[in-house]
Amino acid sequence: MSGTSKAVILARGLGTRMRAESGGAPLDAGQARVAETGIKAMIPMGRPFLDYVLGSLADAGFGKVCLVIGPEHTQVRNYYESEAPLSRLSVEFAEQARPLGTADAVLAAERFADGGTFVVLNSDNYYGPSVLGELNRLEEPAVVGFARSGLIELGNVPPDRVKRFGALEVGPDGFLRRILVAPNEAMLRSGEEIYGSMNCWLFDRSIFRACREIAVSPRGELELPRAVQLAIDAHGLRMKVIKVRAPVLDLSSRTDIAGVHERLRDVEVSL
């Protein structure tokens, strides 16, 4: 079978923004209780938010999932080992002992990847099956570049948050050149659509070398975008950019919960 069938979900984050109180955020008791733990993937929206992410993967053709979690995340492990009604997906776990960053989280899933291609996604973002299907059909490294206008107009991401997302510098051949902290002057002057990363990646095994070689960032983390840039600059990685104008539902803080829940209310989930 051609294409990519494995997905790694990064669910180890501390959830600092989710744990912080957001005055007036309309949460029910169950949502408030889980928000206090910071485990965004398990925020209840009729069912855990992560179920919607996994259901979208299954709809897109993926069959094997690895959840990267911390040793303390027993709620996640217990649910997907014993309670979740899995019929289309197999779910494994990889433990990231300490929250050292997204590149370190990817390294935790190396055994699961087993030398093949795999996608990497955030556990607090909902990507539609049409977007994930683009990656499912590929067998070479790629990143989905989301049009900033689409994130604002079609998703739930406010403009001030979009400005904090990195921008993708894409060559005329359609491959990634650089991941920028912010759009450069040339991008802004051009008036053309700016595409950003929402951590929707397709990797092969070459990414693991780069994840091991990068230095700790000024934020004190081993960051996946820095590993990608190192792989491009030093190892000759060619990463295709798939440009889309599509929504992403971003579950960053308590103020996002009600809106995301409403958007997902009619989404049917089959795991």
Predicted regions and their residues:
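Conserved core of the sugar-phosphate nucleotidyltransferase
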Residues: 128-209, 214
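Phosphate- and divalent-cation-binding pockets in alpha/beta enzyme and binding domains
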Residues: 52, 75-78, 130, 227, ...
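Conserved beta-strand segments of alpha/beta enzyme cores
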Residues: 41, 90-92, 175, 238-240
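Short, surface-exposed amphipathic charged segments that create phosphate/polyanion-binding patches used
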Residues: 105-112, 156-162, 255-259
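Conserved N-terminal catalytic core of the sugar/cofactor nucleotidyltransferase
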Residues: 1-37, 43-120, 219
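The conserved acidic donor/metal-binding loop of glycosyltransferases
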Residues: 123-126
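Conserved alpha/beta core of the MobA/IspD/sugar-nucleotide pyrophosphorylase nucleotidyltransferase superfamily
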Residues: 2-7, 179-271
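A structural signal for short hydrophobic beta-strand segments in well-ordered beta-sheet cores
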Residues: 42, 168-170, 241
